[in-house]
Curated annotation (Swiss-Prot):
Protein name: Podocalyxin-like protein 2
Protein keywords: Cell adhesion, Disulfide bond, Glycoprotein, Membrane, Phosphoprotein, Proteoglycan, Sialic acid, Signal, Sulfation, Transmembrane, Transmembrane helix
Species of origin: Mus musculus
Subunit record text: Homodimer; disulfide-linked. Interacts with SELL, SELE and SELP.
Gene Ontology terms: cellular component: plasma membrane
Phosphoserine sites (modified residues): 569, 594
Length: 603
């Protein structure tokens, strides 16, 4: 009867919460499997529960349990035994909280608040006698980290696993390479010595291991892509090629009459037992592989490889292209292993011819340099040619004497030797040409031709050069002249300066004459008024002397003249003018005229 009474005393919301907790606990016990995201269903349900009711759910049931456990059956007062047991028994909620806090759970952002386990509380309420045994039961909450998902593995473990896988794959690749080397040694006939063969094959594992260690990630990825093809026994020429290829250097055969081993400058292709793998080794690796051989040098030589079969890729495959990490690595896969055909190549003789071409070119170049002696065309200082008869060569461009001697001196000598026998007796090789450049700024070269009898005169050289004028233009010589023309040109420059000086002197003289004439004219203008004054005075005297014959007429004329002379003087404008001297003369003449008039009147 105690349980119904207890249940009746509890408020209705608490009953609903307890019922929900009991159902959730039963469901959690039945279904405790991780979901697709790694979280269990119970953990999701616990997270979805409202947090507002958790304090009420955690405190009230404990109080109710404590009160119900302390009540005596059949009475409303607690007994002494129940009080003692209640004092000795620790609170259930706080003990659970201590257990959860003491565990190694890391709830991440929700570590400040612990979700209580409702199923344990419901079980303790149904059977209070089993409450002390609850701590020994395993918790239903999964031990997980909300900040980090449980399926996430540590980064160090992943790196360790990747390193182990890479090491295993490298070991497998080394074993395959060793097998391929053995097959190559069996299939390929080598005409060199055994020691040279061993030295040639020695650096191949180190080279392959270095290439595989440089790109572990690319090796793993590429090996997964080509796993099916590798199991079939065929290694396809693909992106796996840098790690699966066998870099090696073929020891060259001894050339007849030469004790020097020569190596091919580019990469050599070796067949790998019918496999479509091509290995290319740089020249530096080949040199390191052939250090122990006798009389090895760095010259390029022919590599007779007619006895070596060569794998030819199908026509559908693309040409290997150079990549940024692996030079000369093909980026495309062939159609399949069955499409590749390993046939003896007929281009090996062509390869031999290509390897012999550099030697032929060098020999031709050396042969072209040997026929003429470099001392036949020399460059001298300008002071050494000052007292000799030389020819001035006007060049199309400003070129140095030494550069012209190296590149065009041989042709100039050949042209001169072709023409010289027509004019002079002599053999080829007896002539010497001396060149000099007087100034770095001018496009001129001085040439002196010296034969068995000494320096050839300039007139003879000019006559000889006239026959090869067009050929001279081809080697950059525009025209030519002699020293006399050069001296005439210098005198012409001097005469130009003389004429300029003469012109300046003439202009100065003309200016001086003009200035003198101007001064003379000015002086003449100043002297003219004095001459006019003297002549006018004489005329007046002549008139005065002739007045006795006709005094009346003279008086009238004199009075008119006086009237005309006094009017401008009264106005005052003609006193300072050019006719002021007539007014002055009139004023001086007045007393005389009056005396004459008086005398005439008296008469």
């Amino acid at each position: 009867m105690a349980r119904p009474l207890r249940a009746a005393r509890l408020p209705p919301p608490l009953l609903l919460l307890l019922a929900a907790g009991a159902s959730l606990g039963a469901y959690a016990v039945g279904v405790d499997e991780p979901g697709p995201e790694g979280l269990t269903s119970t953990s999701l349900l616990d997270l979805l529960l409202p947090t507002d009711f958790e304090p009420l759910d955690s405190e009230e049931p404990s109080e109710a349990m404590g009160l119900d456990a302390g009540l005596a059956p059949g009475s409303g007062f607690p007994s002494e035994d129940s009080e003692e047991s209640r004092l000795l028994q620790p609170p259930q909620y706080f003990w659970e909280e201590e257990e959860l806090n003491g565990s190694s759970l890391d709830l991440g952002p929700t570590a400040d608040y612990v979700f209580p386990d409702l199923t344990e509380k419901v079980a303790s309420m149904e059977d209070p006698g089993q409450a002390p045994d609850l701590p020994n039961l395993p918790s239903i909450l999964p031990k997980m980290d909300l900040a980090e998902p449980p399926w996430h593995m540590p980064l160090q473990e992943e790196e360790e696993e990747e390193e182990e896988e890479e090491e295993e794959r490298e070991e497998e690749e080394r074993e395959k390479e060793a097998e391929e080397e053995e097959e190559e040694e069996e299939l390929l006939p080598v005409s060199g010595s055994p020691g040279a063969t061993a030295q040639a094959h020695a650096p191949s594992p180190s080279t392959s291991s270095s290439t595989s260690s440089q790109s572990p990630g690319a090796t793993r990825h590429r090996q997964e892509d080509s796993g099916d093809q590798a199991t079939s026994g065929m290694e396809v020429e693909s992106s796996v090629k840098p790690t699966l290829s066998v870099p090696s250097v073929t020891p060259s055969t001894v050339a007849p009459g030469v004790q020097n081993y020569s190596q091919e400058s580019g990469g050599t292709e070796w067949p790998t037992g019918g496999l479509g793998v091509q290995s290319e080794v740089p020249q530096g690796a080949g040199e390191g592989a052939t250090v122990g051989a006798a009389d090895f040098d760095g010259q390029q030589g022919a590599l007779p490889s007619s006895s070596l079969p060569q794998t030819v890729p199908p026509s559908g495959t693309e040409v290997p292209s150079e990549g940024p990490l692996y030079p000369r690595i093909p980026d495309s896969l062939p159609p399949g292993p069955q499409d590749t055909e390993s046939t003896p190549s007929s281009a090996t003789w062509g390869q031999e011819g290509l390897s012999e071409q550099p030697l032929e070119g060098q020999a031709a170049e050396a042969h072209s340099l040997t026929p003429w002696d470099s001392t036949q065309v020399i460059c001298k200082d300008w002071s050494n040619l000052a007292g000799k008869s030389y020819i001035i060569l006007n060049m199309t461009q400003n070129i140095d004497c030494e550069v012209f001697r190296r590149h065009r001196g041989l042709r100039l000598l050949a042209l001169v030797e072709e023409v010289l026998p027509r004019h002079r007796s002599g053999h080829r090789g007896d002539w010497h040409i001396s060149l000099s450049k007087p100034s770095e700024k001018e496009q001129h070269l001085l040439m002196t031709l010296v034969g068995e009898q000494g320096v050839v005169p300039t007139q003879d050289v000019l006559s000889m050069l006239s026959g090869i004028r067009r050929s001279l233009e081809e080697i950059g010589i525009q025209n030519y002249s002699t020293t006399s023309s050069c001296q005439a040109r210098a005198t012409q420059v001097r005469s130009d300066y003389g004429t300029l000086f003469v012109v300046l002197v003439i202009i100065g003289v003309i200016c001086f004459i003009i200035i003198v004439l101007g001064l003379l004219y000015n002086c003449w203008q100043r002297r003219m008024p004095k001459l006019k004054h003297v002549s006018h005075g004489e005329e007046l005297r002549f008139v005065e002397n002739g007045c006795h014959d006709n005094p009346t007429l003279d008086v009238a004329s004199d009075s008119q003249s006086e009237m005309q002379e006094k009017q401008p003087s009264l106005n005052g404008g003609a006193i300072n003018g050019p006719s002021s001297w007539s007014a002055l003369m009139g004023s001086k003449r007045d007393p005389e005229d009056s005396d004459v008039f008086e005398e005439d009147t008296h008469l």
